[in-house]
Amino acid sequence: MIRDQQILDQLLDGVRRFVSEELIPNEAQVAAQNDIPTSLVTKMAELGLFGLSIPTNYGGLELTMEEECLVALELGRASPAFRTVVGTNIGIGSQGLIMDGRPDQKDYWLPRLASGEVISSFALTEPDAGSDAGSIRTSAVRDGDCYRLNGTKRFITNADKAGLFTVMARTDPESQGSRGVSAFLVPAQTPGLTIGIPEKKMGQHGTHVCDVVLNDAEIPASALLGTEEGKGFVTAMKVLERGRLHISAVCVGIADRLIDESTRYAAQRKQFGQVIGEFQLVQGMLADMKTEWYAGRSMVIDAARKKDLDETVATESSCCKYFCSEMVGRVADRAVQVFGGAGYIADYGIERFYRDVRIFRLYEGTSQIQQLIIARNMLRELTD
């Protein structure tokens, strides 16, 4: 749903210029140094990128799902490392608070998240709880007017930059699976919370994932997200469902960048006395890339519009995440093929995108988990 096309166009134009003038020229430096300059993060905050999804009464832009996806399409044209900086505040790091937080929790944290003053992280995954998120072992034991948290969270995006963690922990050890899991708002400076060394990753250099270790970390009882224990897993699933649309839009944006780069290269690279774009086999690759990009974009916009109409989009979100994350991997592979040997060389940047996009098939639900969700929902609809 687009509420005011003129205002949205102004936002998209600003993001588009920022991507082309500030982010793309700094991609190689960020990848080499494995860090994003503070000056760029400050400009992201000035553009309002940290608060895209946060309600206006807390200082955010409160974009609709369709509007947010259109912005994500533009951000996706730059290295995904840049988008990841703001991505947790837009999505998994803030949405649990927006959806299920108490008024006092929202009043304190959301303005700080919207401005970029605080970066948030979503601490669900554990060493033995990846796709099986319901098997988390991190515990939260009530002790008077506080909780004591113990456990280790793994592969937590932006952990070393975060000022706030939404931590999923088990408050009822007797409950099986996802039952008995609660969500907590845990400040980074909490005694007993430590951050591990950033992992060495295949791609998306510039943003970091780390372990978050909770060793008798004491938080006030008021840090429980919402008002009831045992609602954490439900919150997590709602957050991830929404986040899959955003991630899908980012995948489509990256595919768009790779298609543009590949088409331009095919139009100027000469072999056998002519540009390679005149060869039908190269044209076939370009056509396949464009067709899949268009299909992915159409899926994302359709699902986003349905969500804006308050329709249930659990299946559609998983369809988008599954197709778009796989699609951008195929597009990146074809881009390397179009570039030939140059696509394998770092100077051209194509090999970097090839590595960067591999994670999209893994985080916020692997492709195989998306298949399970889609199929189970299809079968469930038969009995509804």
How should each PLM-predicted stretch be described?
Residues 129-132, 147, 154-156:
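Hydrophobic, small-residue-rich alpha-helical packing segments that form membrane-like cores
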Residues 1-78, 82-88, 100-105, 112, ...:
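Alpha-helical interface subdomain recognition
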Residues 135, 189-218:
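Flexible, small-/acidic-enriched active-site or ligand-binding loops
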